[in-house]
Amino acid sequence: TGLASVAGGFMLLVPPSEARVYMTPGEAAKLFWGNQKLIPISLKLSRQQRNDIKEASGVAVRASKMAVWKTESGGWFVLDSVIGKHEYIDYAVALSDKGSVKAIEILVYREGYGDAVVNPRWRAQFYDKDPSRQLTHGKEIMNISGATLSCRHITDGINRLTKMWELVFSKV
Protein backbone atom coordinates (compact mmCIF):
# COMPACT_ATOMS: atom_id res chain seq x y z
CA THR A 1 0.00 0.00 0.00
CA GLY A 2 0.95 3.64 -0.26
CA LEU A 3 4.33 4.73 -1.50
CA ALA A 4 6.01 1.33 -1.41
CA SER A 5 3.51 -0.46 -3.63
CA VAL A 6 3.10 2.34 -6.14
CA ALA A 7 6.83 2.97 -6.21
CA GLY A 8 7.43 -0.76 -6.54
CA GLY A 9 5.15 -0.80 -9.56
CA PHE A 10 7.10 2.08 -11.04
CA MET A 11 10.41 0.23 -10.91
CA LEU A 12 9.63 -2.09 -13.79
CA LEU A 13 13.18 -2.75 -14.96
CA VAL A 14 15.32 -5.36 -13.25
CA PRO A 15 18.69 -3.74 -12.54
CA PRO A 16 21.58 -5.43 -14.35
CA SER A 17 24.46 -6.72 -12.25
CA GLU A 18 26.40 -3.44 -12.46
CA ALA A 19 23.42 -1.37 -11.27
CA ARG A 20 23.98 0.65 -8.15
CA VAL A 21 21.02 1.24 -5.87
CA TYR A 22 21.63 4.39 -3.86
CA MET A 23 18.25 4.85 -2.24
CA THR A 24 14.72 3.47 -2.29
CA PRO A 25 11.76 5.67 -3.21
CA GLY A 26 10.57 5.46 0.41
CA GLU A 27 13.96 6.61 1.71
CA ALA A 28 13.95 9.53 -0.73
CA ALA A 29 10.42 10.55 0.31
CA LYS A 30 11.45 10.49 3.99
CA LEU A 31 14.63 12.48 3.24
CA PHE A 32 12.72 15.11 1.26
CA TRP A 33 9.54 15.44 3.30
CA GLY A 34 10.23 13.91 6.71
CA ASN A 35 7.04 12.62 8.31
CA GLN A 36 4.66 14.64 6.14
CA LYS A 37 1.82 12.61 4.75
CA LEU A 38 2.21 11.91 1.02
CA ILE A 39 -1.05 11.63 -0.88
CA PRO A 40 -0.80 9.52 -4.05
CA ILE A 41 -2.13 11.33 -7.10
CA SER A 42 -3.60 9.17 -9.84
CA LEU A 43 -2.21 10.92 -12.88
CA LYS A 44 -2.59 9.83 -16.47
CA LEU A 45 -1.48 12.45 -18.96
CA SER A 46 -3.60 12.97 -22.04
CA ARG A 47 -1.99 13.10 -25.47
CA GLN A 48 -2.59 16.87 -25.49
CA GLN A 49 -0.91 17.31 -22.09
CA ARG A 50 2.07 15.25 -23.26
CA ASN A 51 2.35 17.36 -26.41
CA ASP A 52 2.06 20.60 -24.40
CA ILE A 53 4.79 19.46 -21.99
CA LYS A 54 7.04 18.48 -24.89
CA GLU A 55 6.48 21.86 -26.56
CA ALA A 56 7.18 23.76 -23.32
CA SER A 57 10.20 21.73 -22.19
CA GLY A 58 11.66 20.51 -25.46
CA VAL A 59 11.60 16.99 -24.01
CA ALA A 60 9.25 14.18 -25.02
CA VAL A 61 7.05 12.60 -22.37
CA ARG A 62 7.49 8.83 -22.77
CA ALA A 63 4.84 7.59 -20.35
CA SER A 64 1.31 8.78 -19.76
CA LYS A 65 1.22 7.47 -16.17
CA MET A 66 3.37 9.17 -13.55
CA ALA A 67 4.34 8.17 -10.01
CA VAL A 68 3.39 11.36 -8.14
CA TRP A 69 2.46 12.27 -4.58
CA LYS A 70 1.33 15.58 -3.10
CA THR A 71 2.41 16.56 0.40
CA GLU A 72 0.26 18.07 3.12
CA SER A 73 2.15 21.34 2.61
CA GLY A 74 1.41 21.41 -1.14
CA GLY A 75 4.80 20.13 -2.30
CA TRP A 76 5.30 17.24 -4.68
CA PHE A 77 7.24 13.98 -4.68
CA VAL A 78 7.87 12.59 -8.17
CA LEU A 79 9.58 9.39 -9.34
CA ASP A 80 11.00 9.51 -12.84
CA SER A 81 13.60 7.90 -15.04
CA VAL A 82 15.77 9.06 -17.91
CA ILE A 83 18.13 7.17 -20.15
CA GLY A 84 21.82 7.59 -19.32
CA LYS A 85 23.94 6.44 -22.23
CA HIS A 86 22.30 3.04 -22.71
CA GLU A 87 20.48 2.30 -19.44
CA TYR A 88 17.83 4.01 -17.33
CA ILE A 89 18.60 6.22 -14.35
CA ASP A 90 15.81 6.23 -11.75
CA TYR A 91 15.57 9.37 -9.66
CA ALA A 92 13.27 11.15 -7.23
CA VAL A 93 12.50 14.86 -7.17
CA ALA A 94 10.90 17.09 -4.56
CA LEU A 95 9.10 20.12 -5.99
CA SER A 96 7.83 22.98 -3.87
CA ASP A 97 4.25 24.21 -3.95
CA LYS A 98 5.51 26.77 -6.52
CA GLY A 99 7.14 24.16 -8.75
CA SER A 100 10.76 24.85 -7.85
CA VAL A 101 13.18 21.98 -7.32
CA LYS A 102 13.79 21.39 -3.62
CA ALA A 103 15.83 18.20 -3.94
CA ILE A 104 16.87 15.46 -6.33
CA GLU A 105 18.24 12.03 -5.48
CA ILE A 106 19.51 9.34 -7.80
CA LEU A 107 17.83 6.07 -6.81
CA VAL A 108 19.26 3.52 -9.25
CA TYR A 109 22.15 4.01 -11.69
CA ARG A 110 22.52 1.17 -14.18
CA GLU A 111 25.42 2.30 -16.41
CA GLY A 112 28.88 0.86 -15.90
CA TYR A 113 30.35 4.36 -15.53
CA GLY A 114 29.26 8.01 -15.34
CA ASP A 115 27.62 7.78 -11.92
CA ALA A 116 29.22 11.05 -10.82
CA VAL A 117 25.72 12.53 -11.16
CA VAL A 118 25.08 11.24 -7.64
CA ASN A 119 27.49 13.92 -6.38
CA PRO A 120 25.54 16.25 -4.05
CA ARG A 121 27.27 19.36 -5.43
CA TRP A 122 26.27 18.49 -8.99
CA ARG A 123 22.64 17.78 -8.00
CA ALA A 124 22.49 21.00 -5.96
CA GLN A 125 22.70 23.00 -9.20
CA PHE A 126 19.01 22.19 -9.74
CA TYR A 127 17.81 23.48 -6.37
CA ASP A 128 15.45 26.45 -6.51
CA LYS A 129 15.13 26.17 -10.30
CA ASP A 130 11.52 26.67 -11.34
CA PRO A 131 9.40 26.33 -14.49
CA SER A 132 10.15 29.92 -15.57
CA ARG A 133 13.65 28.96 -16.77
CA GLN A 134 14.72 26.35 -19.26
CA LEU A 135 17.92 24.83 -17.88
CA THR A 136 20.71 24.18 -20.35
CA HIS A 137 23.25 21.43 -19.88
CA GLY A 138 26.70 23.01 -20.15
CA LYS A 139 25.42 26.47 -19.15
CA GLU A 140 23.28 26.64 -15.99
CA ILE A 141 24.00 22.98 -15.30
CA MET A 142 27.68 22.03 -15.43
CA ASN A 143 28.83 18.93 -17.25
CA ILE A 144 30.79 16.13 -15.63
CA SER A 145 33.43 14.62 -17.89
CA GLY A 146 32.64 10.94 -18.39
CA ALA A 147 28.97 11.48 -17.51
CA THR A 148 27.95 13.87 -20.29
CA LEU A 149 24.85 11.98 -21.43
CA SER A 150 23.68 11.34 -17.87
CA CYS A 151 24.10 15.05 -17.08
CA ARG A 152 22.26 16.11 -20.22
CA HIS A 153 19.39 13.67 -19.76
CA ILE A 154 18.85 14.44 -16.07
CA THR A 155 18.80 18.14 -17.00
CA ASP A 156 16.19 17.35 -19.66
CA GLY A 157 14.20 15.33 -17.12
CA ILE A 158 14.15 18.20 -14.63
CA ASN A 159 13.04 20.62 -17.37
CA ARG A 160 10.25 18.18 -18.29
CA LEU A 161 9.13 17.78 -14.65
CA THR A 162 9.08 21.50 -13.84
CA LYS A 163 7.02 22.15 -16.98
CA MET A 164 4.79 19.22 -16.03
CA TRP A 165 4.26 20.91 -12.66
CA GLU A 166 3.36 24.18 -14.40
CA LEU A 167 0.97 22.61 -16.91
CA VAL A 168 -0.52 19.72 -14.91
CA PHE A 169 0.43 19.30 -11.23
CA SER A 170 -0.35 22.92 -10.31
CA LYS A 171 -3.92 22.40 -11.49
CA VAL A 172 -4.53 19.28 -9.36
Task: Describe each PLM feature range.
Residues 1-2, 99:
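An N-terminal domain-start capping segment
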Residues 2-18:
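N-terminal export signals
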Residues 16-144, 148-152, 156-172:
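Flexible, solvent-exposed loop/hinge segments and secondary-structure transition points
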